[in-house]
Curated annotation (Swiss-Prot):
Cofactor binding annotation: Binds 1 zinc ion per subunit.
Assembly: Monomer.
Name under which the protein is recorded: Isoleucine--tRNA ligase
Family matches, as InterPro entries: aa-tRNA-synth_I_CS, aa-tRNA-synth_Ia, Anticodon_Ile_BEm, Ile-tRNA-ligase, Ile-tRNA-ligase_type1, Ile-tRNA_ligase, M/V/L/I-tRNA-synth_anticd-bd, Rossmann-like_a/b/a_fold
Keyword ATP-binding in annotation: yes
Keyword flag Disulfide bond: no
Enzyme Commission (EC) number: 6.1.1.5
Residue positions of motif 'KMSKS' region: 604-608
List of residues binding Zn(2+): 902, 905, 922, 925
Single GO term (MF): zinc ion binding
Protein function: Catalyzes the attachment of isoleucine to tRNA(Ile). As IleRS can inadvertently accommodate and process structurally similar amino acids such as valine, to avoid such errors it has two additional distinct tRNA(Ile)-dependent editing activities. One activity is designated as 'pretransfer' editing and involves the hydrolysis of activated Val-AMP. The other activity is designated 'posttransfer' editing and involves deacylation of mischarged Val-tRNA(Ile).
The entry's keywords: Aminoacyl-tRNA synthetase, ATP-binding, Cytoplasm, Ligase, Metal-binding, Nucleotide-binding, Protein biosynthesis, Zinc
Protein encoded by which gene: ileS
Amino acid sequence: MDYKSTLNLPQTPFPMKANLAQREPEQIERWRTLDLYRKVRSRRAGRDKFILHDGPPYANGEIHIGHAVNKILKDFIVKSRTLSGFDAPYVPGWDCHGLPIELMVEKKIGKAGHKVSPAEFRKACREYAAAQVDLQRREFIRLGVLGDWENPYLTMDFRFEADIVRALGRIAARGHLAKGAKPVHWCLDCGSALAEAEVEYENKHSPAIDVRFAVVDEFGLMARFHTADGALGEGPLSVVIWTTTPWTLPANQAVALNPELDYVVVQRTDIKERLVLADALMKDVMLRCGAEGYRVIGYCKGAALEGVQLRHPFYDRIVPVILGDHVTLDAGTGAVHTAPGHGQEDYAVGQRYGLAVDNPVGGDGRFLPNTELFAGEHVLSANDHVIEVLKERGALLHEARIEHSYPHCWRHKTPVIFRATPQWFIAMDKGELRRQALEAIGQVQWIPDWGQARIEAMVGNRPDWCISRQRTWGVPIPLFVHKETGALHPDTDRLIEEIAKKIETAGIDAWFELDPAELLGAEADRYGKIGDTLDVWFDSGVTHHAVLAQNPDLAFPADLYLEGSDQHRGWFQSSLMTSVAMSGQAPYKAVLTHGFTVDAEGKKMSKSRGNVVAPQKVMQTLGADVLRLWVAATDYRGEMTVSDEILKRISDVYRRIRNTARYLLANLDGFDPALHLVKPEDMLALDRWVVDRALAIQQEVIEAYETYQFNTIFQKTHHFCSVDLGSFYLDVLKDRQYTCKTDSLPRRSGQTAMYHIAEAMVRWLAPVLSFTAEEIWQYLPGQREESVFLSEWYDGLFGLDENSRCDRAFWDQMLKIREAVSKELEILRVRGEIGASLDAEVELFCDPPLFRKLSEAGDELRFVLLTSYATVKPAAEAGTDALPTEIPGLELKLAASGKPKCVRCWHHRHDVGTHPDHPELCGRCVDNVAGTGELRTFG
C-alpha cells in the first residue's frame, strides 16, 4: 500500500527561487500603489517621534556603492524604529548647487557670461540638477529605501534658497559674520576659494630651498647672542629660512622664530659667512648645504631676536624678525619665511605684529602687473625664476626637491594655493563660537565614540570658515556694503528678510537681477551689492533650519545624523557651526559614522583598477536584498569590504534564510491561527523551548537595532535559521509534522511554534531584507496588515516556565547530548554500518541527576536524537565497551538496529508487521493512519 497520501507533506506557493531582480521592482510598484509611506505615517501619527535627518548627497551622476551603504543603513534604522512603534519619518534630500554641476553644464553650453548669460546658465544648472535628482531617486527607491520620495528637500528649491539666506541673516545678526582679506585655499582651476572640506591632501614634488635673509645691523644682532670668547666672527651675517613655496617670497613680510627654541650663530670656515638657525637643526642644514667646516660662535633663545631687521633677499625692503609658536623643529632651519597673504599661520602671527597682508597673485594664479621681477608669471611655474633670482643675488644657500603632502582641489585634483582675497567668514572666535561648538560636541552621542575626539580636534584647530565663493550657480550672499567704509548696511536684518521673500518667489535670480535702488532708494549709490555666492557646505549645513525646523513632520534637533566618517570635517561640522551660531546648540542628539567601501584587498575602488562594485549591477543580478544583507553583515565602523566573491557568499546566506522561511510557510499549510493556535501550556516541551529561544533572539535583535549593531542582527538571525532551526528543531519536528494526524495536538503544537517563529522572524528581517520580508508576509496565514511595515515587533512569543523541569538549562544540556550522539552516528555512517541516523539505536548510561532529567522524555527522547530507539539506563549498567563523552555523567552505546523498518516513518521498530491490516507499519503509524493518533508531550 502507498502511504504517501497519509503524510502531511509541506507545500507552499512561496517560490524557492528568489528571482529578486524581477520580483523586487514588482514589490516597489505594489508599495507605490499602496502609498505605503503615507500609510505608515498615518498609522504612527501621534506616537513619539524618531528623526533621522538625511544628509544630502550631491545631485550629480549615478549612485555608487558608498551612496547605497549610506541609504541602506538609514533605512535599517527608520524601519526598525517604526517597528518599535515610533513615528519615524524619512525625508530624503539633495545638495543641488555648486561647482561640479557648473562644470557639467559648462561642457554643454559654455561658461556663464561668455556664450550664455548668467541667468541662462543658472537655469541650465537647475534643469541639470533636477534630472540628476530624478536619476538618483529612482536608484535609491530601487534599493528598497522607504521615504517621502515625492516630497524630498532640494537645496535649490526656492523656499530652501530663501531659508538659506534667512540662516545667513540670523548668523550675521548674532555677530558671527566677518569680512576680511584673509588667506584661503584657492583653486586656480575653479577660480574660487575652497572650504576646508573641499581640500584633499596628496603627495607632490616641490623645490625645497634654504634662503639667506641678510642682517641689517650685524653688530646689533651679535650683541644679542652669548658668545664664548667675545668673538663676533667674520663674513656676511644672515638668518636662514627654508621653504617649499619659493613663489611666495615676493609677498614676504617677516621671518618668524620660536621664542622658546635655542638658536645659534654658525661660523662657516670654508666660505667665510655667518648663519643664524636653530641649534637642533644646525647639523642637518650644514650637511645639506655641503659646509666643509663650521663652528658655533653664539647662542640665544629665539625671544632675544625679536625685532631684528633683515633685508628681503631680492626686494628693497626691510623685514622684521617676529615670534610665533607655530615654528617647529620638524624640518627646515627653525626660521620661517612669513607671508601673511599666503598662509593661515602667517596671517595669524602677522595680525599680532600688524604686518601687511600682501597678495601679489591674481585669481588666475598669475602675478599682478605691478609685481616687480615676476609680473604676469604663473605662480606654479615661477618657482624656477625665483630660484634664479636668489642665485643672482647670492641669497640661495641650498636647493633640492622633495616629495611632501600638499593640498589639492577635491574636484580638479590639482594643487591649490593660499591666497589672501576679500572674503566672507564665519568667525570661529568672534562671539565665542568655537567654545560654544566644543561644548555642544560634548552633549552629543558619537557612534563610534572616537568620533568625538576627532571632531573636537578639527573644531579646536580650524580657521575661520570662508563661506564666500566666486561662482555663478549658488545661493547669493545678499548683502549691501558701504563703498567707502566697507560696513554692512545698518538695516541689514530687514533687507535680508525682504530679499528672502523675493527669492522664495523667484529663486536666486531675484538677487542677481535686483536693482539695489528697489530696496535702498536714494542710498543705492553709496552701497555695493555683493556678487559672491555661498559655500555649498553652508547650503547643506543649514538643513537643520530649512528642513528640520520647517517641515511639520520633523523636529529640531534631530535624533540622529548618519554619514560617512569624512563628514566630521564636512556636513557634521558645517551643520554644527551654523546651528550653534544660530541657536547655541547642536542640530543632532547623536551622530553615527560609517567607513568607506574597499575591495577584498582593502584597496580604494576605482574604474582604472577595475574593482568597482556598482550597486546597479548587483541589483540587476543578485537583487537589492543581497546588497542590503551585505551591509548588515559588515561592521560599518571600519572599512567595508565588498567584492563579487563576498556578495556571492552573502547570496548563499540569503538562500539559507529564504529556505528556512519557505520551510516554515510550507509546514503552515492548512494552519489557521484563528482556529488552530495551541495555548502555550498545552504545547509540547520542544515547541515551548523553540518559542522561548525565538523570544531570546528577538530581545537581542531589538536591542541590536536600537544600538545600531546590524552585524549582530545578521549573526543572530543566521545562527537561529541554520543552527537552532535547521540543524535541530526543524530536523526533529519533521517526523511529527509529516506523520501525526493533521489536526492532532502534536502537529498543531508544532505548527503553532512555527507560526510564532515566522511572525517574529519576518519582522526581524523586514528592516534588512525588506523585499523578502514583504514577500513572506503575503504568504503567512491569518488576518494581517497589507504590509509588514504597518506592523510592530511581534508580541506573541513567550518564555519557558522557570519552574519547569524542561527549562533553558535542560535544553542546553539536551543539545549537547544530541551533539554527542550525532558525532557517534557519523562514525557509524562513515563505517557503512548505517545509512541514515534512524537506522541506529542508542543507549545512554547516565549518572542519577542526568538519568532523572532524561527520563522526563520517556520514549520521545528518540525523536530528539533522531534514532529509532533511545534508551536511558543507569551508569552502573555501562560495560567496558561504552563510549565516553565530554558530558559529565554520560556514556553511550550505539549500534545499527536489527528491527524492521516502517515504510511510513522509516523508524526501525519491534512492532512493525504486528498489525494485520498494515503489516508494513509500526504501531505508532497505525495509530496515526487508522486510529485516534499518537500522543506526544515532549518532542
